[in-house]
Amino acid sequence: MGAIDLSFSQSLLFSSSRSNLSSSTHRSVSFLPPGSKSRCLPPLRSMSHDDDTASKEVKLWGGRFEESVTEKVEKFTESISFDKVLYKQDIMGSKAHASMLAHQGLITDSDKDSILRGLDDIERQIEANKFEWRTDREDVHMNIEAALTDLIGEPAKKLHTARSRNDQVATDFRLWCRDAIDTIIVKIRNLQRALVELALKNEALIVPGYTHLQRAQPVLLPHVLLTFVEQLERDAGRYVDCRARLNFSPLGACALAGTGLPIDRFMTANALGFTEPMRNSIDAVSDRDFVLEFLYTNANTGIHLSRLGEEWVLWASEEFGFMTPSDSVSTGSSIMPQKKNPDPMELVRGKSARVIGDLVTVLTLCKGLPLAYNRDFQEDKEPMFDSTKTIMGMIDVSAEFAQNVTFNEDRIKKSLPAGHLDATTLADYLVKKGMPFRSSHDIVGKLVGVCVSKGCELQNLSLEEMKKLSPVFEEDVFGFLGVENSVNKFSSYGSTGSNCVAEQLGYWVNKLNITST
């Protein structure tokens, strides 16, 4: 698979009416005043530098320091190598912040316009791969702010008014997570469609259902496939819930205590599509529960996908032989010429361990931290980025696999008679005749014992053999025996009966807007 882009386009939620900015929600937010014209600034001047120059550049926080950090400390503490993927969100937050500062009279409109145009130019440079990310500038925030200062000078120094990197990074990360969730939900819908379409192509196919990996009862294949559709729907719901809880703005909380400057946090929250500002400034910068919830949801989704992978790896084996993946989603062996392996689904199963591990990493990271912000939080990014990239790949390849498999109907049908799959249906027959279920369970168990000793199936027994165990059996019993008859007897809501499964399929066809297969 190709690399997955982890920079997401920003989508906005409903805006707060308390803002002085536009309350439109489903269009891009403009941070230029009406009637102003955007102009393209000259390219950033070269930021190439040797080690000498780098060591002499004063850190933006360096006022009280008399020595530069050592090279080892600088390399150990930098995060630009991974947090630069937040550049869109960082620029977006800075635009909203600058517009608010101007609106509140904390900077001039001229300064604001210079800042906005400079940020636009930096974004273009980044997207054209012409921006030089500098380790000595530590992180995405400092790289962009320092570059903005190089570009426009004095106005850039006013941008950080009433803002700390503590609330800045929390804002950026919430925006990133919000966009990532939107992308994942779209991918889940695509996988659900692939599974439903596969079910529609095999609507009447009966397969063995298993418990303890032992044959249990006959079920329709669409019923099995819709199991994963339902699980994915709950996963999507968890993402929606997570998105709603994280969609509150930390911006303006500053380091931890807020500010005495007359900022408008509702204005920036609205501009960025947040529901409203977070109520408590310490909470805004000191908690990463939104990251944990997102990581848990990825892990839970990963477990569901892992079980799908396990099912299909088994079914593709010679021992089962229920499905055949196409060559386009299979791989071979370097030594065994005959091999055709369902590697994508094996890796889906395997990569679930990564998303679980990423969750455990951040759970451990957050345990026992004192209030408020701690540099430990820098370590929440890589697990989050890895988990998100991994779960997206797992979802995508599962959909690809579902679109490139065929079920071996003849092989499945030949295997169906084995295992006495209709035994429970036979017990239900006796219940319908008035027998207590425990008694019917005992009688059918004894009939299975007869079949095992004779090497036959229940439907091969004669009526006389059945009557030896209970006079309740009549000729109509044969309408309950055999996998087809057994499946047709299921009628409870959500069951594997043909009518029930048809209703389930109809529900998902409508919900997912599937028009053809």
Curated annotation (Swiss-Prot):
The record marks 346 as: Increases basicity of active site His. It catalyses: 2-(N(omega)-L-arginino)succinate = fumarate + L-arginine. GO terms for cellular component: chloroplast; chloroplast stroma. This is Argininosuccinate lyase, chloroplastic. It is found in: Plastid, Chloroplast. Residues 1-45 form a transit peptide. Its EC number is 4.3.2.1. Belongs to the lyase 1 family. Argininosuccinate lyase subfamily. It comes from the Eukaryota. Pfam families: ASL_C2, Lyase_1. The active site is at 212 (proton acceptor), 333 (proton donor). Keywords: Amino-acid biosynthesis, Arginine biosynthesis, Chloroplast, Lyase, Plastid, Transit peptide. 2-(N(omega)-L-arginino)succinate binds at residues 79, 166, 211, 341, 373, 378, 381. Its main location: plastid. GO terms for molecular function: argininosuccinate lyase activity. PROSITE patterns: FUMARATE_LYASES (PS00163). Gene3D superfamilies: Fumarase/aspartase (C-terminal domain) (1.10.40.30), Fumarase/aspartase (Central domain) (1.20.200.10), Fumarase/aspartase (N-terminal domain) (1.10.275.10).
